[in-house]
């Protein structure tokens, strides 16, 4: 049956498949828009190095860490990573206020390495050094599915009664062969099970899945399948789409120099991301569709340094297609 409906952008859509956009509006559910609705104003996400490690670095499950990861564990942009946690917080917001002097609400973001890879008393002591500061309205935690025991999730549930809590759960790929190749040292099955436990034990906490486009051996179709599995198998509230940045002093650097890794072109990346956005249900918040890397550490792709050019290229392609997030999304099948 042919049907028309008025979508949330005020556009009449044909069976939900024609996804035209109004000029000047993003074609996806952006994090900035979400936070403005949630908190009523622009809100800073304040990255902090809390001194945790990773289980695939310290020998708990493996050694060496993920092959794409630098020695800072994705915390290369943190202003003062060696300072005490509270001092880091204020140095970060002082730095951000140079560009946005009027922002007064903050989300503490324990970003690099695995920020639940410790005993609960250690986790609690480190978190509490930052989350009680004036203006803090939420907590974002970067972690892995093998580092969330029930007692830690229960603590996050308690925190979610006080503030907005987001568990940023690293996945990177749903393919076991890729996961082994990059030394993730956990399975996709464990990821799905962990998402289910977090949803059950800490229902107010939001879950954001991290995926990387451009991992060794993964094709366009495989990257699309990563997203499809992620959003249909898991009750998640957000997703981060990263471009693989090849960095100096990483194990993946060797793969590249030995010809086992082909970096994506900007055109390939834009095409992949637009295809992915179309199959992500529109209620899922897009926390990232590209990323940042320090120029002095980046081997490639060098085009990724022009972040706004990449963002504009994605938006331009979505507009050319007459498309928007979720226009090709399938029914979700996760178990609540």
Where are these regions (language model features)?
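N-terminal [4Fe-4S]-dependent radical SAM core
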Residues: 22-85, 90-107
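Auxiliary Fe-S-binding modules of radical SAM enzymes
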Residues: 23-33, 42-44, 238, 245-336
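Hydrophobic faces of well-ordered beta-strands that scaffold small-molecule active sites
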Residues: 46-48, 106-108, 139-141, 165-169, ...
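Structural recognition of alpha->loop->beta junctions
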Residues: 66, 130-136, 225-240, 311, ...
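Conserved non-cysteine loop/helix-boundary elements of the Radical SAM core domain that shape
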Residues: 76-83, 112-125, 139-202, 213-234, ...
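A contiguous, low-structure linker/loop signature
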Residues: 91-133, 138
């Amino acid at each position: 049956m042919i049907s028309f409906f008025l979508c949330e952008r005020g556009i009449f859509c044909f069976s939900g498949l024609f996804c035209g956009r109004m000029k000047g509006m993003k074609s996806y559910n952006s994090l900035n828009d979400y936070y403005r609705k949630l908190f009523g104003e622009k809100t800073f996400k304040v990255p902090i190095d809390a001194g945790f490690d990773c289980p695939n670095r310290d020998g708990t499950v493996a050694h060496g860490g993920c092959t794409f990861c630098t020695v800072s564990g994705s915390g290369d942009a943190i202003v003062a990573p060696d300072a005490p946690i509270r001092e880091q917080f204020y140095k970060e917001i002082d730095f951000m206020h140079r560009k946005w002097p009027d922002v007064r609400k903050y989300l503490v973001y324990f970003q690099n390495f695995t920020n639940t890879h410790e005993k609960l008393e250690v986790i609690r002591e480190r978190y509490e050094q930052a989350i009680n500061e004036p203006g803090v309205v939420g907590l974002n935690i970067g972690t892995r599915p093998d580092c969330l025991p029930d007692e830690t999730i229960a603590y996050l549930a308690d925190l979610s009664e006080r503030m907005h809590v987001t568990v940023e759960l690293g996945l990177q790929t749903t393919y076991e062969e890729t996961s082994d190749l990059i030394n993730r040292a956990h399975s996709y099955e464990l990821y799905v099970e962990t998402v289910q436990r977090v949803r059950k034990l800490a229902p107010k906490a939001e879950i954001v899945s991290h995926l990387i486009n451009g991992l060794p051996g993964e094709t366009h179709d495989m990257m699309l399948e990563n997203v499809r599995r992620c959003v249909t198998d898991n009750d998640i509230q957000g997703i981060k789409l990263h471009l693989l940045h090849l960095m100096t002093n990483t194990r993946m650097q060797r793969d590249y120099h030995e010809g086992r890794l082909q970096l994506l072109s900007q055109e390939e990346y834009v095409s992949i991301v637009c295809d992915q956005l179309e199959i992500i249900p529109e209620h899922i918040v897009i926390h990232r569709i590209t990323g940042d890397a320090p120029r002095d550490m980046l081997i490639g792709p060098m085009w990724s340094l022009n972040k706004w050019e990449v963002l504009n290229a994605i938006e331009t392609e979505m507009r050319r297609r007459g498309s928007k997030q979720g226009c090709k999304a399938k029914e979700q099948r996760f178990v609540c």
